[in-house]
Amino acid sequence: MSAKPFVFDTDVLIIGGGFSGSWAALTARQHVENVLIVDKGPRDWGGLGGMSGGDMIVKQPEFAAKDLVEELVYYYDGLCEQDVLEEILNQSYERFKDYEKMGHEFARDDSGRLMSIPQRGLELMRYYFYHPYGKGGAHTTQILNAELQRLNVQRIGRIEITDLVKDGDAVSGAVGFHAQSGTPCLFRAKAVILAAHNGGWKGSYLLNTCAGEGAALAYGAGASLRNMEFIENWNVPKLFAWEGQTGMLPYGARFLNGEGED
């Protein structure tokens, strides 16, 4: 016997409940009343960001975005969208201040100056880390969820979206099912935002759950895809993937080969 489907109506439907989806919801909520986030993981789990350090690369006001972009062009041998990176960097300080306003605490020295760690041997690309170190991802998830709750953004977990619904050329919703009960779900919306990870091979931070549904949904609905050559692939040692090295090395961590050599 077929289960009766759940039907939801909203102004904006956001597929993906990680940090990107949360920020999309907060922005959408500035313009419309009803915003709904659906995620195939547990409700409010925070996506991959919840397992991050909660640290942040920021273009502080004393720097120029073009100078940071020049470093990235050098680092990536030019294989980067410079205009997109510059826009992200230009907006990064506003997001940094938003996080601080929500209660996210970035480390400072005794004089109150922000502490940072240079990235990949570059001078200006610096990340500003959460205090206490190592618990920032969980705290970022907590404060984003609190803000979503304050703004009455609805969230539903364990929803696997299988297809987007179109009305002519416009996307008007999505269909899927509840991953635990199998109940079909229909979501009707005036706008749909895809904020799901693209997936990859041998990813870290539980990326095995990111199967690329977001890109597949967009492609199935007629969207053009680009940068697919940069889908994530990690060829890393069997016993140690690289997570955390940026923070560990300044604290004295060492990498040794099989002979015990540094």
Where in the sequence are the language-model features?
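Glycine-centered secondary-structure boundary/capping sites
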Residues: L68, G103, G121-M125
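Surface-exposed alpha-helical segments enriched in charged/polar residues
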Residues: K97, Q119-R120, A146, A216
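Helix-loop-beta segment of a Rossmann-like dinucleotide-binding subdomain
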Residues: G78-Q82, R113-T141, G199-K202
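Short, charged low-complexity intrinsically disordered segments located at boundaries
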Residues: D98-H104, R126-H131, G247-M248
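Rossmann-like flavin
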Residues: Y75-S116
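Residues forming the flavin
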Residues: M1-E70, R108-D110, P132-D262
